[in-house]
Structures are given as structure tokens and as C-alpha cells.
Amino acid sequence: MVHALRETYRVLKPDGLLIDLRPAAVHRRVGFTEGDGYRLRWVMRENFDDDHAADRAVAHVVNDGFFKAEGRTRFACYRVMDTLDDFQEWLKDFINKGKFPSHDWLVRRVGRAPEVSDGKSSIVVSAPLVLRTLRKQR
């Protein structure tokens, strides 16, 4: 990733801005809608090796003086799915893209939850996103 960041540096105009928007390296939470919010029921088990490597790469190009960190904010992101099928499809895609371990245990638990069988609640996956702004230096 350091190579990609250096290539970004090369093509950015002087004083250009790099936007780094990624999910935070925290386990996603799964629950159900409840009133205006949601109720947490389970926590996923992701591996964050790639996330930590990306953080190190960003720190590396900042420490080397290619970019200056100008801002950082963290905000909530909610993915709402109306059916168990929607959740299973999202989870399968999520696991395949990230090469994460199977979460069949989670699908079984969500499928057995009364909130799914009554059809009155949506399934919610929450995870924060981190937005960083980096300014090209030199």
C-alpha cells in the first residue's frame, strides 16, 4: 500500500488533498431495528491485519513527509437489511471480499431470532467509518 500512496503522491497536483475513507478496525455489530434506533445482539469476528497494515502505510508516508495529516473524523455507518436472505447475501459478499472466517454461527442465530420471524424488524449491521484528509507536501 505504501507504493500506491506514493503513486497517489506522484499524480496529485501540488498541495493536493488525499481522502482516506475506510471502515474502522473494530468488529461490526449486528442487531435489529427497535423504535428509532436498534438493539445490539451480536458482534462479528473479523480479522484486522489488512486494516492495521493500511494504517501503518498511511503513517509511513506521513512520517516520510509525503503527506501531512490535516483531519480525521469517525462516524457511524448502518447497513439495514429487511430480510434474512438480504443479510445472508451481504454477509457472503463481505466474507468473500475480506477473506474472513465463516460466520455461519451468526446466520443461524439471526435466523432463529424472534425479530426475524415476526417480520416487524430489520437487521442492522453497524460499524464506524474513519475519514482522514492528507495534504500533499513538498
Ranges and model annotations:
Residues V2-L17:
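A short glycine-rich, Lys/Arg-flanked "PGG" loop and its adjoining helix->strand segment in the class I
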Residues T8, D20-R22, M81:
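Long, contiguous hydrophobic alpha-helical segments, chiefly transmembrane helices and signal peptides
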Residues K13, L21, F32, D49-V58, ...:
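Conserved short hydrophobic patches within well-ordered secondary structure
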Residues L17-D49:
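Conserved class I S-adenosyl-L-methionine
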Residues A24-G31, H52-V61, W105-R112:
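Low-complexity, flexible helical/coil segments
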Residues V43-R72:
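Active-site capping/gating segments
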Residues N63-R138:
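Conserved Class I S-adenosyl-L-methionine
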